């Protein structure tokens, strides 16, 4: 038996089904479209997850209450003037910090994005780090693990990252994803869940050549850690990473300045 469909109906089906299939494999944010090739279609869900978390991170940074820290409380601080603010959410404690990095935003963004695999070389809290897949220039899948920090044993993360140039700066966002084809090489490490991680890099009008940096994070560490313990240490861990990150960029600036002479 021959199945016949009128040509107008065929066009209707192609029109309705075709775009829906392609939309799953592409994402447009701020006029830039990430499109997955055939070999990377397994990352379609991760791409959409990255888009979701980017929207959340951008909305958070643009919220006037974030700028004034309304609804946040002072969690940790140090003698350098760094302050970690926190707020409790249904998914756990969210923490944020703002700092100045001694390099311009273009450099900071490039180093943050491309320097993933070198993290263990200069960050004592990182045990391993690598790129699982890099389907587009603005979207990738990464894995990393931290060493034992304070009372928290090492955790492993697998997350999608995405970035965009926004105005004269950048926004980078990340969230944990499940990649069926990914097999961890680090047995025994608890797989933590990154609900939201984001960074905003902006030029500093008061100090040209430097970058105003805002970082926000909300992670569920899993395992058998009591919530009270997690809340006590998560801000301190962010503070430690901020100091380490700033020292890293200072070293890169010194190297750049030395090579320029």
Question: Model regions: which residues?
Answer:
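Eukaryotic helix-grip
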Residues: 4-6, 13-261
């Amino acid at each position: 038996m021959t199945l016949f469909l009128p040509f107008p109906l065929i066009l209707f089906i192609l029109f309705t089904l075709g775009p829906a299939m392609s939309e799953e494999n592409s994402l447009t944010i701020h006029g830039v479209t990430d499109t997955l090739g055939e070999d990377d279609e397994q990352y379609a869900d991760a791409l959409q997850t990255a888009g979701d978390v980017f929207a959340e991170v951008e909305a958070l940074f643009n919220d006037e209450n974030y700028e004034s820290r309304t609804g946040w409380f002072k969690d940790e601080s140090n003698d350098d003037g760094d302050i970690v603010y926190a707020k409790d959410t249904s998914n756990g404690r969210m923490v944020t910090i703002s700092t100045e990095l001694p390099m311009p935003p273009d450099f900071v963004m490039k180093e943050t994005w491309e320097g993933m695999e070198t993290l263990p070389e200069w960050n004592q809290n990182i045990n391993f780090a690598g790129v699982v897949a890099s389907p587009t220039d603005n979207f990738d899948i990464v894995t990393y693990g931290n060493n034992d920090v304070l009372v928290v044993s090492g955790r492993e993360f697998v997350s999608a990252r995405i970035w965009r140039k926004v105005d004269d700066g950048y926004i980078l966002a990340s969230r944990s994803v499940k990649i069926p084809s990914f097999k961890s090489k680090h047995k025994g490490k608890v797989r933590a869940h990154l609900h939201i991680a984001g960074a905003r890099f902006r030029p500093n009008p008061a100090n040209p050549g430097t970058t105003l940096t805002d970082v926000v994070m909300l992670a569920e560490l899993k395992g058998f850690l009591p919530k009270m313990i997690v809340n006590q240490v998560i801000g301190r861990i962010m503070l430690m990473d901020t100091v380490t990150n700033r020292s890293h960029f200072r070293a890169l600036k010194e190297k750049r300045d030395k090579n320029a002479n």
